Design a protein with these regions (language model features):
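Beta-propeller blade termini and top-face loops
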Residues: 1-248
Length: 248
């Protein structure tokens, strides 16, 4: 269980061995809730050790029991957590920001399911699958065209587009410059992009301006610009940039 308001962190892990008639507190700490620590970990937060406060219980949470070994549990919040003692203790194999680590799963897990002995995890980064109980997690989304742009801009003169694929970075298409058409210009929670109306070599995303090189062997340089007043970050609201034809 967790708190969907206030701290939005882990409240407790409970176990039932009589089909839900009674429940026993398993984790974490000596009692439900309380401040996070090494002995009272918060699995809804961002920290691999579970010592940070808060989290996203209102947004991402998943839980599954291994069909071969009922003592082994998989829990998803921001990170993927594993227990081998029916929920008494937990470890995070790889933090959301450690894509090179064994067992890595993208941040913000929404569902965890077993199909036979295959473990499947759905998250903001797509779908991950394991056929060894979760030790190794592989991205399993080849052929799925599921990139979701929250916002993007395009040049009226050329085939240049820049858009934010929320939680999957900011993506750029610069004519036919890049292999497979698109390149990621930045990670994180990109939600928009703009291409200068009068000069398609200049673009803007959530973090900075971009000077497009037009050559995949050359870097895309960035520059700072005044982002205040800010474009809205709230779902359902719209923000845009307008160009002064006298100076664009």
């Amino acid at each position: 269980t967790g708190s969907a308001n206030g701290g939005s962190g882990t409240y407790g892990i409970y176990l039932s061995e009589d089909e839900g008639v009674t429940w026993t507190f398993q984790c974490c700490g000596n009692q439900p809730a309380g401040p996070p620590s090494l002995t009272n970990i918060n699995m809804m937060g961002w920290d691999k050790e579970g010592e940070d406060d808060g989290g996203q219980y209102y947004y991402d949470v998943g839980l599954a029991v291994d069909p071969v070994n009922p003592q082994k549990l998989h829990l998803g919040g921001v990170n993927h957590w594993v227990s081998t003692d029916a929920g008494a203790t937990w470890v995070c194999p790889a933090k959301w920001s450690e894509p090179g680590e064994i067992g890595y799963v993208h941040a913000d897990i929404h569902d965890i399911r077993f199909f036979g002995t295959e473990l499947w995890i759905a998250c903001d980064g797509g779908i991950f699958m394991s056929n060894d109980g979760g030790t190794n997690m592989d991205k399993s989304q080849v052929g799925i065209e599921g990139t979701d742009f929250w916002g993007f801009g395009a040049s009226p003169q050329s085939d240049v587009m820049l858009g934010g694929a929320y939680h999957n970075g900011t993506l750029l298409k610069d004519n036919d410059t890049y292999i497979n058409d698109w390149i990621c210009t930045g990670g994180g929670d990109g939600v928009r992009g703009f291409v200068n109306f009068g000069n398609d070599r200049i673009a803007y995303d959530d973090y900075e301006g971009r000077i497009l090189s037009g050559d995949r062997t050359m870097n895309i340089n960035g520059f700072q610009f005044d982002s205040l007043p800010n474009a809205s970050y709230i779902f359902g609201e719209s923000s845009t940039m307008e160009w002064d034809p006298r100076n664009n």
